[in-house]
């Protein structure tokens, strides 16, 4: 187990609004686990040679042209710092993009103080931070995407191929399926091959698992 440092995590706050900078200063003073190194209003004001933060809290509004690209540039300049976006931008529109650009977390300025402190703590330990609302939204998107992908693949099957899958889900082998459907074993093998291709399944075992999930309405 690696020893954990008790030194306060150093924070650099980049925001063009004075009221936000004052609010952050007042907040951080109440939490000894953090140390506010300073403020900047523009990305050009920040250079690695002059400051070495553990956390960079930034409002992407400071980058007038492309805030997402600014995050990538910031990550290149401060490769050892964790970036937390603290902004009024809608998290449902910008959070995922910010994470892909290199941010470790995303917090709305309207979030409760406790959430911001949790966000700072999480990113300082190398963890990703998103609000509970945003985490649920992303999980729903993933679930809906997978369900839609399964449905679209499933609709490519012919009626006879669907019947073959039904028999596979009942643990029937090719000989039994051929007898049940009154067709040759070679035809069943051809059906199975086409089913795997249409469903993008790489092996017979994957086909069996898909058939079982379908039988249980869990695909």
Enumerate the predicted regions with their spans.
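Conserved acidic segment of CheY-like receiver
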Residues: 7-20, 24-28, 56, 157
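Active-site residues of response regulator receiver
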Residues: 59-60, 87
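Helix-turn-helix DNA-binding segment
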Residues: 150-186
């Amino acid at each position: 187990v690696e020893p954990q440092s008790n030194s306060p995590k150093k924070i650099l706050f980049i925001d063009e609004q004075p009221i936000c900078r004052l609010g952050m200063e007042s907040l951080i003073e109440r939490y000894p686990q953090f140390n506010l190194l300073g403020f900047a209003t523009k990305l050009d004001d920040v250079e690695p040679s002059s400051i070495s933060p553990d956390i960079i809290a930034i409002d992407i509004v400071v980058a007038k042209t492309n805030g997402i690209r600014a995050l990538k540039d910031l990550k290149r300049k401060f490769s050892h710092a964790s970036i937390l976006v603290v902004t009024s931008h809608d998290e449902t529109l910008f959070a995922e993009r910010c994470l892909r650009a290199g941010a470790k977390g995303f917090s709305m300025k309207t979030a409760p103080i406790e959430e911001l402190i949790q966000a700072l703590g999480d990113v300082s330990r190398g963890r990703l931070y998103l609000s509970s609302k945003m985490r649920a939204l992303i999980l729903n998107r993933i679930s809906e995407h997978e369900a839609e992908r399964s449905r679209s693949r499933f609709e490519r099957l012919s009626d006879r191929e669907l019947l073959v899958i039904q028999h596979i889900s009942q643990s029937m082998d090719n000989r039994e399926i051929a007898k049940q459907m009154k067709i040759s074993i070679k035809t069943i093998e051809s059906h199975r091959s086409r089913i795997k291709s249409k469903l993008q399944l790489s092996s017979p075992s994957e086909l069996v698992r898909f058939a079982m999930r379908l039988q249980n309405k869990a695909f």
